[in-house]
């Protein structure tokens, strides 16, 4: 999933801007005064505002108009935009306050931590889906239209049900089922973690299960080498799904990290607009023109 709220066809990089004239420009235009008004003492908002504005000096008409459309939506639906921004902060902070990733040496610990984080993330994803369903009709911009349509397409009820089912199976597993293929020298290769057969049975079937032909062996309680080998096989199987879950966690975290960064700029714009309203001063969305046209028209300019 992509955010695409600062650019119509890509996520914003928001890397540090190194302009040779940035210090002079900041001082001459008192840009820090603007950034502080947008940030309201939030260091993250301050930095995003600074980087976004300076990196936007070379934006084309399409990008400027695209952002203005989204900005107008933000002004009309400020509480909704702030709620989405708060969700992104909540998810990122939940990662910082979890035990996830501390015991990465042990696959079982990675799996347990990944399951816990996915469940936290699912709760926040469901909140985002609810906000989308309740407010999608209130937004008119191309940016938010694409964003909300993506949320409804990707985060369906079936998606949530399927993920929850997988998590329940992983958390309440009764042993593990792993398949192998035989390689050279009859060494096991291409391990795969399989889903356990979890057919519902009545009490009679549980007491007298149908017999099926299978081959098995038991390890002697004192066979330390055998127990160690079995433990390694167990960890290998768990590691397959643990890595997959960890990648899913990282994907969700990346999405909300980008969402926070891009909405931080619009949150700063909302902060600035609200302060101008308190001062009862006007604001507008200027019409951009090419620099070669040398058009410069304004009215009701004021000092703040």
PLM segments and residue spans:
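Amphipathic alpha-helix face/heptad-repeat signature
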Residues: 113-117, 237, 255, 259-262
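Charged/polar positions within long, soluble alpha-helices
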Residues: 126-133, 168, 185, 189-198, ...
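Conserved NTPase motor "head" modules and their coupling/switch loops across ABC/AAA+ ATPases, GTPases
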Residues: 1-8, 14, 262-304
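Extended, charged coiled-coil "arm/hinge" scaffolds of SMC/Rad50-like chromosome-maintenance ATPases
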Residues: 217-247, 253
């Amino acid at each position: 999933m992509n955010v695409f709220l600062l650019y119509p066809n890509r996520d914003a990089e928001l890397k540090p801007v190194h302009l040779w004239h940035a210090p002079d420009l900041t001082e001459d235009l008192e840009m820090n005064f603007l950034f502080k008004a947008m940030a309201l003492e939030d260091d993250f908002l301050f930095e995003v505002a600074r980087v976004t504005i300076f990196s936007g000096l070379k934006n084309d008409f399409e990008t400027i108009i695209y952002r203005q459309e989204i900005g107008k939506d933000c002004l009309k639906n400020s509480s909704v935009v702030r709620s989405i921004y708060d969700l992104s902060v909540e998810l990122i902070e939940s990662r910082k306050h979890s035990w996830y990733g501390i015991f990465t040496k042990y696959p079982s610990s990675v799996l347990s931590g990944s399951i816990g984080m996915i469940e936290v993330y699912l709760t926040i994803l469901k909140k985002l889906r609810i906000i989308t369903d309740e407010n999608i009709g209130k937004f008119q911009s191309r940016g938010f239209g694409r964003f909300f349509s993506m949320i409804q397409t990707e985060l369906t009820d079936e998606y949530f049900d399927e993920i929850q089912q997988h998590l329940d199976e992983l958390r309440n597993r009764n042993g593990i089922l792993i398949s192998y293929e035989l390689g050279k020298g009859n060494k096991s290769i291409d391990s795969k973690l399989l889903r356990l057969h979890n057919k519902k049975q009545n009490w009679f079937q549980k007491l007298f299960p149908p017999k099926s032909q299978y081959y098995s062996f038991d390890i002697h309680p004192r066979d330390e080498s055998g127990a160690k080998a079995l433990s390694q096989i167990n960890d290998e199987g768990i590691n397959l799904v643990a890595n997959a879950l960890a990648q899913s966690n990282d994907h969700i975290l990346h999405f909300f990290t980008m969402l926070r960064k891009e909405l931080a700029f619009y949150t700063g714009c909302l902060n600035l607009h609200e302060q101008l309203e308190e001062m009862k001063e006007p604001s507008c969305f200027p019409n951009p023109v090419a620099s070669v046209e040398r058009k410069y028209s304004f009215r009701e300019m004021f000092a703040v």
